[in-house]
């Protein structure tokens, strides 16, 4: 039995609250059960040096966890003087995922920075960050259009992500912390709304997984992401 009696393919209760802060061009509080992440999208004119003069934009990301977002307090990375490897890996994943959603040529010479700050962690913080950041990105692009700086939104489609894994011998979708810590296989999947995959990160923590189990996990992820993208679209219509 899963926590809260969820079915194998059932995601946690999902909530996307837009315009959560007033300064950023896009801001979303995303909640997957007890995992809560604040995602903001900030627009700056200009692009990194390696893109200057090419007539295209850039999307980048930063990720962090508040000290007491976890069961016991973590020291701030700023206090340590450097980012950890996990943080750098996750923010690169978020940036890669969201760049896939944007026509960078149509964006023009603007840079959009997605900041994902974990307020409370209960598993799936990187997938929640991607899901929330995509909605914040859509709002930021809409703000550029509304300001007359872009003729149309360069968003090619929604992007969302979910974790899947094998827990106690069974494939499940959207793992919370107690499941993630006990998973025999843990996988994060990022997809476009048309079903094309952007990234698949999968690791056997205990017993290696079979080809058939891989296909089962990908099917669970596809169905879960379908539910998430519908929630994103519903939020953007409000």
UniProtKB/Swiss-Prot annotation:
Q: Which residues form a coiled coil?
A: none
Q: Which Gene3D superfamilies match?
A: GHMP Kinase, N-terminal domain
Recorded hits in Pfam families, A to Z, give: RNase_PH, RNase_PH_C
Name the top EC class. Answer: transferase
Q: What is its EC number?
A: 2.7.7.56
Where phosphate is bound, by residue?
86, 124-126
For whether the record's keyword set contains ATP-binding, the answer is no
Q: Could you confirm whether the keyword Transmembrane helix appears in this record?
A: no
Write out the entry's keywords from A to Z: Nucleotidyltransferase, RNA-binding, rRNA processing, Transferase, tRNA processing, tRNA-binding
Entry-linked InterPro entries: ExoRNase_PH_dom1, ExoRNase_PH_dom2, ExoRNase_PH_dom2_sf, PNPase/RNase_PH_dom_sf, Ribosomal_Su5_D2-typ_SF, RNase_PH, RNase_PH_bac-type, RNase_PH_CS
Q: What does this protein do?
A: Phosphorolytic 3'-5' exoribonuclease that plays an important role in tRNA 3'-end maturation. Removes nucleotide residues following the 3'-CCA terminus of tRNAs; can also add nucleotides to the ends of RNA molecules by using nucleoside diphosphates as substrates, but this may not be physiologically important. Probably plays a role in initiation of 16S rRNA degradation (leading to ribosome degradation) during starvation.
- NCBIfam families in the record: RNasePH
Cited HAMAP family: RNase_PH
Q: How does it assemble?
A: Homohexameric ring arranged as a trimer of dimers.
What PANTHER family does its record include?
EXOSOME COMPLEX COMPONENT, EXOSOME COMPLEX COMPONENT RRP41
Protein name as annotated: Ribonuclease PH
Which species expresses this protein natively?
Edwardsiella ictaluri (strain 93-146)
């Amino acid at each position: 039995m899963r926590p809260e009696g969820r079915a194998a393919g059932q995601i946690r209760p999902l909530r996307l609250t837009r315009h959560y802060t007033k300064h950023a061009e896009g801001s979303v509080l995303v909640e997957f059960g007890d995992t809560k992440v604040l995602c903001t999208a900030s627009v700056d004119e200009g692009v990194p040096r390696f893109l200057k003069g090419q007539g295209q934009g850039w999307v980048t990301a930063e990720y962090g966890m508040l000290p007491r977002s976890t069961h016991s307090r973590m020291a701030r990375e700023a206090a340590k003087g450097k980012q950890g490897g996990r943080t750098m890996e996750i923010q690169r994943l978020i940036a890669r995922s969201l760049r896939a959603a944007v026509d960078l040529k149509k964006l023009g010479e603007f840079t959009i920075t997605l900041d994902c700050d974990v307020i409370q962690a209960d598993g799936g913080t990187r997938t929640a960050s991607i899901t929330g950041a995509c909605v914040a990105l859509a709002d930021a692009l809409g703000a550029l259009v509304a300001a007359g700086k872009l003729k149309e939104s360069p968003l090619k489609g929604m992007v969302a992500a979910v974790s899947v894994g094998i827990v106690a011998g069974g494939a499940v979708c959207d793992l919370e912390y107690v499941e993630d810590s006990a998973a025999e296989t843990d996988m994060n999947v990022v997809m476009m709304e048309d079903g094309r995959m952007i990234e698949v990160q999968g690791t056997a923590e205990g017993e290696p997984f079979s080809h058939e189990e891989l296909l089962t996990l990908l099917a669970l992820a596809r169905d879960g992401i379908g539910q998430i993208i519908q929630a994103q679209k519903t939020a953007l219509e409000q």
